[in-house]
Amino acid sequence: MKLAVIPGDGIGPEVIAEALKVLDVVVPGVEKTEYDLGAKRYHATGEILPDSVLPELREHDAILLGAIGDPSVPSGVLERGLLLRTRFELDHHVNLRPSRLFTGVRSPLAGAPDIDFVVVREGTEGPYTGTGGAIRVRTPHEVATEVSTNTRFGIERVVRYAFAKAQARRKHLTLVHKTNVLTFAGSLWQRTVDEVGAEFPEVTVAYQHIDAATIHMVTDPGRFDVIVTDNLFGDIITDLAAAVSGGIGLAASGNIDASGTNPSMFEPVHGSAPDIAGQSKADPTAAILSVSLLLNHLGDTEAAARIDAAVAKDLAARSGTASTVEIGDRIAAAV
């Protein structure tokens, strides 16, 4: 395996070091190439993602990212220049976000909710394509538009990915949208789900409006298995999914080119947390679970299962506080 590693900013290098420690135990001999992309490079050279780096990234089987963002750089500069550009250049049309409440982890929900579902979010369309504009700016008559772009091609490939996930899990898929108001895009999403769903007769299909889905994710999260949704609704609902299952500190994600043409990128959901960087206070669990997602994506399900089991064992036994390295050592020993 050839792995591109982008430690990034803040706590990124610390959590990635522990994730790689675990990876080296379950899959020895991975060929790694580290890229110094992030705030330091931006300040030193003015570069965020040089054109010369993209062809190099494409030569790898996968990309592992730590965290991006630094208070010394204006908000959004690094995120747009690195994360969004990578997503579009490498056609990461699937954003995969598992949500699982591990034993030993407290949920803000009452009782012991059954939480084990995944959200499949479309990643390259919707209102995030930069289509729109503004006129009469800074006048009383200013008008701004933000256009949501939805294509049959873009929707179908994400829907197919979601159905395949559902087929391999508990065979239940929920489309989340707002078809009663967003009638044009909603109709296209619903028809695509209906047509692709006919090819997966074992998968039960349901629909929920986005507002209803947020309610049920809090009151009855066990009803969900695989959720498929668009870019904007997915952006919102995935953070809620992380919150009910213990917080973004435990949330892993995959930005995936389901065609396999380009390497997919895996990362913890949490930010760079510059206030605790360098203090070994960061929890590397989300980065380690991102390695599990990476291995699952590449077909090494056995190694991924070993990581998941080791993480579950560690979380169930945790008490008090532990350093970043201590947590990484414990999970590496448990795999």
From Swiss-Prot:
Entry's cofactor comment: Binds 1 Mg(2+) or Mn(2+) ion per subunit.
Disulfide bonds listed in the record: none
Any one Pfam family match given in the protein's UniProt record, by short name: Iso_dh
Binding site for NAD(+): 271-283
Binding site for substrate: 87, 97, 121, 211
Matching SUPFAM superfamilies: Isocitrate/Isopropylmalate dehydrogenase-like
Pathway: Amino-acid biosynthesis; L-leucine biosynthesis; L-leucine from 3-methyl-2-oxobutanoate: step 3/4
EC number: 1.1.1.85
Subcellular location: Cytoplasm
SMART domains registered for this protein in UniProt: Iso_dh
PROSITE patterns per UniProt: IDH_IMDH
Binding-site residues, Mg(2+): 211, 235, 239
Cofactor: Mg(2+); Mn(2+)
Region forming the signal peptide: none
Catalysed reactions, as listed in the record: (2R,3S)-3-isopropylmalate + NAD(+) = 4-methyl-2-oxopentanoate + CO2 + NADH
Cited InterPro entries: ICDH/IPMDH, IsoCit/isopropylmalate_DH_CS, IsoPropMal-DH-like_dom, LeuB_actb
Feature type site, description Important for catalysis: 128, 178
GO cellular component: cytoplasm
Keyword Transmembrane on entry: no
Keywords: Amino-acid biosynthesis, Branched-chain amino acid biosynthesis, Cytoplasm, Leucine biosynthesis, Magnesium, Manganese, Metal-binding, NAD, Oxidoreductase
Record function comment: Catalyzes the oxidation of 3-carboxy-2-hydroxy-4-methylpentanoate (3-isopropylmalate) to 3-carboxy-4-methyl-2-oxopentanoate. The product decarboxylates to 4-methyl-2 oxopentanoate.
Family annotation (PANTHER family): D-MALATE DEHYDROGENASE [DECARBOXYLATING]
Protein name: 3-isopropylmalate dehydrogenase
Native source species: Nocardia farcinica (strain IFM 10152)
